[in-house]
From Swiss-Prot:
ACT domain ranges (all copies): 679-760, 788-861
Organism this protein belongs to: Legionella pneumophila (strain Paris)
Signal sequence residues: none
Any one GO biological process: regulation of nitrogen utilization
Keyword Transferase recorded: yes
Activity regulation field: Uridylyltransferase (UTase) activity is inhibited by glutamine, while glutamine activates uridylyl-removing (UR) activity.
Region described as Uridylyltransferase: 1-321
Keyword field contains Nucleotidyltransferase: yes
Name of the gene: glnD
Family: Belongs to the GlnD family.
Gene Ontology molecular-function annotations: [protein-PII] uridylyltransferase activity; phosphoric diester hydrolase activity
Reaction equation(s) it catalyzes: [protein-PII]-L-tyrosine + UTP = [protein-PII]-uridylyl-L-tyrosine + diphosphate; [protein-PII]-uridylyl-L-tyrosine + H2O = [protein-PII]-L-tyrosine + UMP + H(+)
Cofactor: Mg(2+)
NCBIfam families the UniProt entry points to: UTase_glnD
Name the UniProt record assigns to this protein: Bifunctional uridylyltransferase/uridylyl-removing enzyme
Amino acid sequence: MKNDNRIIKNTIKQFKEKLCKDFSQKANITSITRKLAVFIDTILIQLFIKNKLHFGDNFCLLALGSYGRRELQLHSDIDLLILHTEKVSNIQLQRAQKFIQDCWDVGLEVSHQITTVSSCANLASQDLSVISTIMDMFLLCGHGALMEELIYQTHTLHMWPSHQYFFAKLQEQQNRYAKYGETAYNLEPNIKNGPGGLRDLQILLSISKRHFKIKKLAEGIGYGFITDKEYEELKYCQNFLWRVRFALHMLAGKPEERLSFDYQVKLAQFFGYQDQSHILAIEQFMKDYFKVIKRNRELNEMLLQWFNETIVYHQKQKIIRLDDEFQLSNRFIEVRNNRVFKQNPQSILKLFYWLVKRPDIEGVRASTIRLIRESLFLMGKRFRESKETANIFINIFRTGNDPYDALQRMNRYGVLAHYLDCFATVTGQMQYDLFHAYTVDQHTLFVIRNISRFKKNEYAKQFPLCAKIISALEKPEILYLGALFHDIAKGRGGDHSELGAIEAQQFTQRHYMEAEDSKLIVWLVRYHLLMSQTAQRKDIYDPKTIEQFCQLLPHARYLDYLYLLTVADICGTNPTLWNAWKDSLLKELYHAAKTRLHKQQELLDEAALISIRKQYAMDILISDGISSRVIQDLWSQFKGKYFLHESPEVIARHTKAILNSKQFPVVIIMPHHSQGGTEVFIYMPHKDERFTITTSVLSNHHVTIQEAAIITCDNQFDLDTYIILDENNQAFLNEQRARDIQKSLCDHLANTGRLPAVSRRRLSRALTHFNVKTQINFIDDNTNHQTQLFLVTNDRPGLLATISRVFLTLNIHLHNAKIATAGERVEDMFYISNQTGYSLNHEEKTILKEKLILEISKSKY
């Protein structure tokens, strides 16, 4: 018996290998999935007969789910139902269990149920998944009357009438969408369960089976709910997804459903995609994938809406006239006749204007969605150059209401891509990195959604400054259009901000926009990264930084638009990207620039600013009973840079801690004054290796450094400030953890022995799939006798500790650091000098660059 099972197992293996070979040679995927199902039939029937279950009328073996539909993928589960009569003996039931064991022994991934017809029907009446799989059952072997009885007992006359089944399946889909983030455009999408995936096809078949009692979706053409063209589109989507899924199973050697980064690369290679000058093979493959997902979801939405109207709202319609062309039917917008778009193509856009103007409209009637899709060819050159068309499109953004849902529908139905050629090029465009979580088109729409959220009361607490600014914004449509175009040139090669500004300029001219409005939109697109780059890469406490930033703003009102776009952009790039620290940096930059622009104050010299901050801090300390002479004696040792970088409140807090301390080092861990991060303040006798020690200790405690200010005072004491975040990129809330870090820093900084070892931690799975080439550039700052070192490399645990060790080895002094991580990519700015306190010369730069590249390459673990 064991030998028989081994032979069968080997036969299955050989058959699957043959199928994989055929598939690799472009065999038809529908034929392959059916061949596999039929082959598995023969194995199961053979095992069923071997266990003597085919005699008499006691047992029936049924295939369920995708296996029942004859759509078996390479490593899909084989769903089986064994029905038996009430009179079976224990010996016969043991044979049924032995049959299942034989299935497992030959390597079949079988999920099964052994039950009676009545028990199965009872379970189906309570469980949506059971009734759904039963509807796909296929008789393999045994007494067919048992299956017929189950079909009768689970008929809509007895359970799950079509309207109840429809609502349950609709809720199931909504729950599934919520689980996968409401979008199909995630970095590592699930081909089976994600929005737009294979489940979106299966729900259409299940509901149509339940309502129309059909066996195949093609039969639905006769009922009028699907056209020949739509059916062909669904078949195309299905075949594409089946091919990808079969290849995914083949490459993974298991039932893998997620297109993880490593499999995306392999799939692109398998399907013959090749890298091009400005777009990777993987990005081309995923763009095709996302386009199919988008089309699949679009058809899913339209046909479910049709079911909703047919199954649920088949009663008398409540009609409300909107204008000569549109009306509401049970709160869904529809055309008043099927000639509307042909007679006036501009009405295609007008429909979406109504959706924005009337937020009470719940959606679009399925018949009208179908008409939109069939009328896209009308949106040609003449349509796009029409002034009426331009006015309607701009008015979508001028209603004062949220345009996100309407724009999302315009994207799903293909209207945006037909109206804006440049939008068509970014539809489905992904970027192969961890920073951008969505395709460019979906990210763009999320940015617009975020802008709309700033207006809503439920988001005012999360974005109070944004809510305040947008409430007074003169022309919100400018902000929306800036958002629509800010990434429009992604994937072309070159500077997407500059290329996008050209597209925006052409758009504003074609849409007859006022010169000042056009100028602002184009400027927003060109400079949409300015604020985030300034806040995260430069010293925003330096008045020169604020002055340089403000010089790029043609008018004070530009700042409001740029701030709102920046926050919306960051929040729409990746759900994990926005945090309190970024929030605080942008707010501080905004307020500093606002003061400079609105008060038109003269740029104060450093001495004046230092004097002002000292006086405020002095007042705080004197009110606490500390002598001004003691304060001045201490401050006389501090560099002016310290007073520029810190607020008066923080200066007072640091001063008080130092004066009250009886031993060194002084280590204070406290919330940063902006509450966006946690501050680590260190004051101690000068020690060259203190930056290396500090970065190593913080790395071992799994915290990340966002900023570092390193100062050696005139009395040869070090005065250093770090801003740190926890693993979730948030400020510390755990006081015990802060105390542990404080103690560890004190112990190691006081120790004159060896440097603390940096604990080795594995890279996350996602990080291992990306390789950012280490790039190092130098810029000399002759005013401050410093060199700016800009470093780009792969993120990894302990990176800053590695860099600090190189600095220590080469006697490089760090003065300031700005740390920025974008997914797998680190972009760090270090302000350094040589051991004599001057900018690095050419030889020193060369040695430092070579050493950094070497040590960073060795630290990738």
